[in-house]
Every structure is written in C-alpha cells, then in structure tokens.
C-alpha cells in the first residue's frame, strides 16, 4: 500500500513538471487598479536651515527715504528755523492771546491750522486754545502729513473773503495764506447823532490790516484803489517779505524793490515814507491836542470812549496807518495819502 502511494506522488510530480515545461511566455502587465484611499499624514520633519536675508521691503525703504528728505545734513530746516526765530511770528508773547476764543484763530499756531482745516473765519471759533503756541512750521505748512517734500506745501492759498469788510476778497497768490489773519477785524462804525461810541483803548482796524491797505479799503472817509504792489508783485506778501530765497525773517529786502526801482537804496523810494511820517506826526499832534490820543507814538492809544464823528474819523485813520499797517505808505501810497487828507478834513468840520 505504501508503495502504491509513493508511486502516485511521483506520477503527480512528473505531470506538474511536464505542464510547467509546456507553459507559454508571460503576458503583458494589466492596467493599474484604482488608487486606494489616502493614508494619514506622516509626522512633521525637522525645520531646515535658515535661508539668506532678503532685500529690504518697500515700507522700510520708504520710511528711510522720506525722513532724510528733510532731516539730513543740509541746512534746509535749521536755516529756516534760525530765521524764523527772530521774526515777529516766531518770537514775542503775542501767542499768549491764543487762550481767548476771539484771538486764538490767529494768535495760536495750532488753533490757526485747525480753523483753516475747518474753513472758519478768525471770529468763528467757539473756544480759545488752552495751550496756545507760537506759529511754527506746522502753522503755515502741511508738515508730517505725507512725510515727503509735499509736506512743505502751504496750508492754503485760496483767495480770502474778508470777514469784516463786506464784499471784499483778496487774491494775491501765495500771499493769500497771510491774509487769513492780516485783514481788518473791524470797520469804521456808523455815527449816532453825530457821535461815534464804544471807543476802546484798542479801537480801530485791529492788528494786521496790510491786505486791506493794499486793496485800498477799510479806512474812514476815503475810498481807494488797489495799490500797484497788489497787482505787480508776484505772490504779493511773499514776493516782498520773503524774496526769491524765501527768507523766513519776513523782513522785506531792498533787493526785491530794485527789480522795478533800480536805483533804490532803502524803502523811502521817491521820499514817500518821509512824506507820510511827517503827515502822521502832524495828525498825531492834532489828536493829542483834541484830547483823544494819549501820545503821538506807537505807545499812543485812544483816551476817550466816544468822540464826534470828524474827530473819530481822524483818530481811526491815524491808528490804521501809524499803529497797524506800519509801511509808511509803501503798501499803497495813493490810498495812504487819501486817508490822511480825509483825516485832516474831518478835523476841520
């Protein structure tokens, strides 16, 4: 029996080998089966080494460039500030009046900028500046708004409609900025029964009526025309008081006058200042004699609270020319003469 089983096993092995020997070559690989589901992510590998530093970004580059555009080793800022520090605007104690609502819009640098931004007249502020400051770069220029050279642009150069003189507008180029303050605060009042009342120690046009003098308006008893310096001088105030070099002392330079008055050696061109000073002295003496003026100097102030219209007319024009405009006729010689003539005529009434 065992022999029979062994023989059968050998036979099966022989048959298997025979079949294997008769098999053909392997066929081509079948198509790939569908992808199986995605396996879970493996663990995070270690961080690679730090790469080289990149170039400076745009923000850092812009910040550096715009600062050094002004804050550099030139005298661009220091020179202007040195000149400004000795100017009337950059020195003195006038800024202390900025705590008053009626004064802050011109006497405080910060309040001036704020009211210009809001489009207000000097008399439209509701409150004074609790911390008034002298006028500085930011008062007239748009400092630190773009951090580029555009920051030196003026706060405004729009024509200025006077807030006290009805219907009057000043359009003098860059000088328009100045006229936002350098304009009359009052006009000559109407007489009541031949008398002018409410005269105070600080009566008159108030400080800075140079713009109205240039336009030939704002006086008492006289009508004028715009002076030649309003129409012929480019940028009016800026043209004369800063010149081509834009000097920030604001002291006028005779060299500017010499563009037209080639032989000028001072501001007394054709003797106009000598003439006007003599007439002012004569008028001041008459007003002191009339008992309405304390003294015939820059320290002189009205000593009465009311006066006849003629006397008040003379006093108003003396204050306008002597105390407030202070150009001794340079701003508008014909109108200055007309104001003095009206003053003397009024005293004789």
Could you describe each region identified by the protein language model?
Residues 2-10:
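Bacterial N-terminal signal peptides that target proteins for export
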Residues 19-21:
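C-terminal motif of bacterial Sec signal peptides marking the signal peptidase cleavage site
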Residues 24-63, 265:
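Collagen/collagen-like triple-helix recognition
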Residues 60, 73-97, 104-279, 326-330:
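Inter-heme linker and motif-flanking segments adjacent to c-type heme-binding CXXCH motifs
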Residues 62-70:
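Short, contiguous pre-domain boundary segments
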Residues 265-273, 277-349:
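Mature extracytoplasmic or organellar-lumen-exposed domains after removal of signal/transit peptides
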């Amino acid at each position: 029996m065992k022999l029979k089983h062994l023989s059968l096993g050998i036979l099966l092995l022989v048959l298997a080998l025979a079949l294997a020997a008769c098999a053909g070559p392997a066929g081509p690989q079948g198509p790939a089966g569908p992808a199986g589901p995605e396996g879970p992510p493996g663990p995070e590998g270690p961080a690679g080494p730090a790469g080289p530093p990149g170039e400076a970004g745009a923000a850092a580059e812009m910040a550096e460039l715009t600062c050094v555009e002004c804050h550099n080793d030139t005298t661009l800022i220091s020179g202007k500030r040195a000149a400004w520090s000795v100017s009337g605007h950059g020195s003195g104690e006038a800024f202390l009046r900025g705590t008053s609502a009626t004064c802050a819009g011109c006497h405080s640098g910060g309040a001036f900028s704020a009211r210009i931004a809001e489009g207000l007249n000097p008399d439209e502020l509701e409150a004074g500046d609790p911390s008034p400051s002298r006028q500085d770069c930011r008062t007239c220029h748009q400092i630190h708004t773009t951090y580029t050279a555009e920051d030196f642009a003026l706060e405004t150069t729009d024509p200025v409609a006077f807030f006290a003189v009805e219907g009057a507008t000043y359009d003098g180029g860059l000088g328009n900025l100045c006229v936002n303050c350098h304009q009359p605060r009052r006009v000559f009042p109407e007489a009541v029964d031949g008398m002018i009342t409410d005269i105070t120690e600080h009566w008159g046009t108030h400080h800075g009526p140079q713009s109205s003098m240039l336009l030939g308006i704002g006086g008492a008893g006289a009508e004028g025309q715009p002076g030649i310096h309003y129409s012929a001088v480019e940028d009016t105030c800026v043209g004369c008081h800063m010149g081509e070099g834009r000097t920030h002392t604001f002291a006028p330079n005779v060299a500017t006058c010499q563009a037209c008055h080639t032989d000028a050696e001072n501001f007394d061109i054709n003797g106009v200042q000598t003439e006007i000073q003599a007439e002012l002295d004569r008028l001041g003496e008459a007003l002191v004699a009339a008992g309405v003026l304390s003294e015939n100097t820059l320290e002189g102030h009205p000593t009465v609270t009311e006066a006849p219209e003629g006397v008040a007319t003379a006093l108003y024009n003396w204050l306008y020319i002597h105390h407030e405009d202070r150009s001794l006729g340079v701003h508008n010689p014909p109108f200055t003469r007309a104001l003095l003539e009206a003053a003397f005529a009024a005293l004789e009434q």
